[in-house]
Amino acid sequence: MDDPFSTLAPRRGTQPLLSNWATIGISELHGGALGWGSWWSNLSRLGSSFGSNLKNLGLKAWNSSTGQALRQHLKDTNLQHKVVEGLSTGIHGAVDIARQEVDRQLAKRLENYEPPRVASTEETVDDVKTVALPSKEDESERVLVTKIREPPPPYDAVFGPAPSAETNKKQKFEETLQNAGLVSSPPAPIAAPAAIAVPAQTTMSHPASSRRRHHWQGTLDSIMGLGLQPIKRRRCF
């Protein structure tokens, strides 16, 4: 929105008092002579140049005679090995200190530990109570006779006497005669007369009364009304 803030300024008639700074507050304002983009580019350029200059100085110092002498002295004194040994010694020392602390805590707990008290045999014997066991009754007295199993009946009493050879021959002879038609077969049993089913008595149901059948009509008449019903009475004056 390019409407300047001068529209909010006090006016003298139609002329605003800030007419000389009418461009204040619009999109054409770029900060005057100060450009933030140039500042950022200058800072980034300065940082990159500073880093490259520092790198070049370090390489020159490392490759110089002083740097070579320093490296040779470090190699002669075996500084790298000493640093590694110092680090390993410090690590082992820290581990030893931790182990000593753990051992100290364990020893302290063992000193404060009290073993459980074991009761002596005499006390245990005194604490034991003698309990009288009930006398064992005779096992024969506890046996309850619930059922007496009788011996099975003999074969002859159930199936009858075993047929002899003569009876078998007689039965076979009678069967052959029956097959030949010489001996009449016994008459078939006469079936008993079947019971005649007597029909049940049916009762005639009378139709419902017209009043009950037309119950809704009676309800309608009571709602609508039938007028006054005349009543004839004889009176003597």
UniProtKB/Swiss-Prot annotation:
- Which key words are in the record? Capsid protein, Cytoplasmic inwards viral transport, Disulfide bond, Host cytoplasm, Host nucleus, Host-virus interaction, Late protein, Microtubular inwards viral transport, Phosphoprotein, Ubl conjugation, Viral capsid assembly, Viral penetration into host cytoplasm, Viral penetration via lysis of host organellar membrane, Viral release from host cell, Virion, Virus entry into host cell
The superkingdom of the source organism is Viruses
Regarding how it is modified after translation, the entry says: Ubiquitinated by Nedd4 following partial capsid disassembly; which might play a role in intracellular virus movement during entry.
User: Residue ranges for motif Nuclear export signal?
Assistant: 70-79, 218-229
Q: Which residues form the propeptide?
A: 1-32
HAMAP family the record matches: ADV_CAP6
Query: What is the name of this protein?
Result: Pre-protein VI
Q: Which organism is it from?
A: Murine adenovirus A serotype 1 (MAdV-1)
Q: Which gene encodes it?
A: L3
